[in-house]
């Protein structure tokens, strides 16, 4: 099985909260696509709560688009990581990590402004596969933790996993 890019970085050296360029590529027509690792928690030290990450999934994507979309950037998708330590964000364009970090910080401030569960978008059985598995208080606690900690940048050059460790497990 091919080794995915996300498994070639040393998770023991990752900082959080932090932004990392996970992948860059071009479409056949030449459009730049960038995938960002938005790491909320230090891997293997903490995870986002199930209900909190699910509620953030519903809120975060819209708020990030509000702060990041422009003439040169368009968010395609923001999805939670299976390990529940963050989100992957795919977009058209090549914004700098600090621009993404600033948008993320503003999106977390937006989460804190949501006042009631009913304000969570697509929170119904028709648009959500587990619409009862949400917690606005948990999402707000995550947002406050990110704001309080600040958002750094993880550089791939500092996280390259030694080849001798690639197949261990």
Curated annotation (Swiss-Prot):
Keyword Metal-binding included in the entry's annotation: yes
An example Gene Ontology biological process: quorum sensing
Keywords, sorted A to Z: Autoinducer synthesis, Iron, Lyase, Metal-binding, Quorum sensing
Cofactor annotation remark: Binds 1 Fe cation per subunit.
EC number: 4.4.1.21
PANTHER family given in the database record: S-RIBOSYLHOMOCYSTEINE LYASE
NCBIfam families recorded: PRK02260.1-2 (NF002602)
Record protein name field: S-ribosylhomocysteine lyase
Gene of this entry: luxS
């Amino acid at each position: 099985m091919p080794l995915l890019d996300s498994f070639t970085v040393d998770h023991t050296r990752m900082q959080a909260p932090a932004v990392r360029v996970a992948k860059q590529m071009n479409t056949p027509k030449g459009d730049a696509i960038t995938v960002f690792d938005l790491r909320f928690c230090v891997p293997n030290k903490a995870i986002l709560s199930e209900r909190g990450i699910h509620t953030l999934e519903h809120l975060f994507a819209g708020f990030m688009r509000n702060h990041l979309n422009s003439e040169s950037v368009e968010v395609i998708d923001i999805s939670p990581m299976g390990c529940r330590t963050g989100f992957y964000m795919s977009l058209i364009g090549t914004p700098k990590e600090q621009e993404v970090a600033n948008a993320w910080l503003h999106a977390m401030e937006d989460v804190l402004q949501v006042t009631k569960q009913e304000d969570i978008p697509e929170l119904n059985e028709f648009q959500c596969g587990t619409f009862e598995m949400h917690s606005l208080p948990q999402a707000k606690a995550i947002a406050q933790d990110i704001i309080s900690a600040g958002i750094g940048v993880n550089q791939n050059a500092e996280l390259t996993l030694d080849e001798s460790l690639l197949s261990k497990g």
